[in-house]
A protein has these predicted regions:
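N-terminal pre-domains immediately preceding structured catalytic cores
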Residues: 2-5, 15, 22-321
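Sec-dependent N-terminal signal peptides
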Residues: 10-17
C-alpha cells in the first residue's frame, strides 16, 4: 500500500527560493562545527556496513560532511550510496547542523531571493518567478528542499564537485541526483510511477512528491576524520581554524591512537598537505609505527568522474581491434 500522496503539477508560485543566502556573514550559518562526521570510527565502531536499498524500508537518513564533499544516503544505519558534491561559497556557506528534506521536485521553478548577489545581477530580480523552461534557472532538473531556502539540486557539471560553488546549497551531478531521488521514491513507496519520472526527465513539466515524514539530513563540518582505521585530513575550506595541531592530537587520542611520540612539526606537515582540493590520508597503523608522513598520501578530495570516450576515441579503439 502506498504511504504518501503524490501530485504532478506546475508549481511556479509555490516553489521556494533557491539557496538561503542574503547578506548575512558566513559565521552566522555555522551552527554546530564540532559534530563528528557520520563516517567517523567513533560513531561506527570502525566499520560501515553497506546495503542495497530496501524498497518500503522507511528508515532513511542523509548525511553531508562539507570538507569531504561527501553526501551519503543511509537506510537502517547502513550505507546505501555516497555521492560527491559541491557546496556553498565562503561568503554563502552551507548550513551546518540538522535539516529535513520535505519534497522531491523534478523541473523546479526558481525565485531569486532578496540578497546582495541577486541585487548585483543584471539577469534576474529578487522575487521573480523563473520557470523550468527559462535558461536563467540554475537549479537544473531536480531539487530537494531542506527548509529555509536550503536545497540539494543539480550541479552544473563535474567541475562543481569538490568546490565552493553555490550560494548555500548542495550541488550534485544530474545522474547522481536522479539516483538519489529514485532511491527515495522506492524506499518511501511514493505514489509516482517510473513512467512519470521518465516523462519528467524528458520534459520541463514540474513533478513533485511530498516526503511525509520528512527525511533527516545531518550536515557536519569535520576536517579530521578517522574512518575504517584511516585518518583523513580534509582542507579547512571555510577557514574555521579546525586544522590545528591541538585538534589533530585530540582527534587521534579520541580514537585510541597514541600520539605522544608525534612531534608538532610532523603534525604541522601532515595538516599542511590538506589544501585546496587535496586531502591527506594515512592509516592509524602507520601513525603508530612512526610512519605518519612517509606512510600517508595526498589525494584528491573528490575522485574525478569517469570521462566519456569521444567519437574519435571510439573509432580508434574499433580500428585497433
Amino acid at each position: 500500500m502506498r504511504k504518501n500522496k503524490f501530485t504532478a503539477r506546475f508549481l511556479p508560485i509555490l516553489l521556494l527560493f533557491a539557496c538561503a543566502s542574503g547578506s548575512a556573514s558566513a559565521q552566522s550559518y555555522v551552527q554546530d562545527s564540532k559534530r563528528d562526521s557520520a563516517r567517523s570510527d567513533k560513531l561506527t565502531g570502525g566499520r560501515i556496513e553497506k546495503t542495497a536499498l530496501i524498497a518500503g524500508g522507511n528508515d532513511l537518513k542523509i548525511t553531508v560532511n562539507v570538507p569531504a564533499f561527501q553526501m551519503t544516503l543511509w537506510q537502517n544505519g547502513k550505507e546505501v550510496k555516497t555521492y560527491p558534491i559541491g557546496v556553498g561559497l565562503k561568503d554563502y556557506p552551507i548550513f551546518i547542523g540538522s535539516r529535513r528534506a520535505s519534497e522531491v521536485i523534478w523541473n523546479p521553478s526558481w525565485i531569486p531571493p532578496k540578497s546582495d548577489w541577486v541585487a548585483e545581477s543584471k539577469k534576474v530580480k529578487a522575487g521573480e518567478i523563473i520557470l523550468p523552461t527559462d535558461p536563467r534557472n540554475p537549479l537544473g532538473k531536480l531539487k530537494i528542499p531542506l527548509g529555509d531556502g536550503y536545497l540539494i539540486h543539480q550541479a552544473k557539471g563535474v567541475g562543481d564537485l569538490g568546490g565552493l560553488v553555490s550560494h548555500g546549497c548542495v550541488r550534485v551531478l544530474q545522474t547522481d541526483l536522479y539516483d538519489l531521488a529514485e532511491k527515495i521514491v522506492a524506499a518511501r513507496e511514493l505514489d509516482v510511477t517510473p513512467k512519470q519520472i521518465i516523462a519528467a526527465k524528458k520534459t520541463k513539466k514540474t513533478l513533485s512528491a511530498e516526503l511525509n515524514p520528512r527525511i533527516p539530513v545531518e550536515i557536519t563540518y569535520d576536517t579530521l576524520v578517522v574512518e575504517a582505521g584511516k585518518l583523513h585530513i580534509y582542507p579547512d575550506v571555510y577557514d574555521r581554524k579546525q586544522n590545528t595541531i591541538e585538534n589533530l592530537r585530540a582527534e587521534l587520542l579520541s580514537n585510541g591512537v597514541s600520539e605522544s611520540k608525534l612531534k608538532d612539526n610532523t603534525l604541522k606537515k601532515m595538516l599542511g598537505l590538506a589544501a585546496a582540493k587535496k586531502q591527506f590520508t594515512v592509516s592509524v597503523r602507520n601513525i603508530e609505527a612512526g610512519r605518519a608522513l612517509i606512510g600517508g598520501q595526498t589525494v584528491s578530495v573528490v575522485s574525478r568522474a569517469p570521462q566519456r570516450r569521444t567519437t574519435s576515441a571510439k573509432r580508434k579503439r574499433r580500428t585497433s581491434r
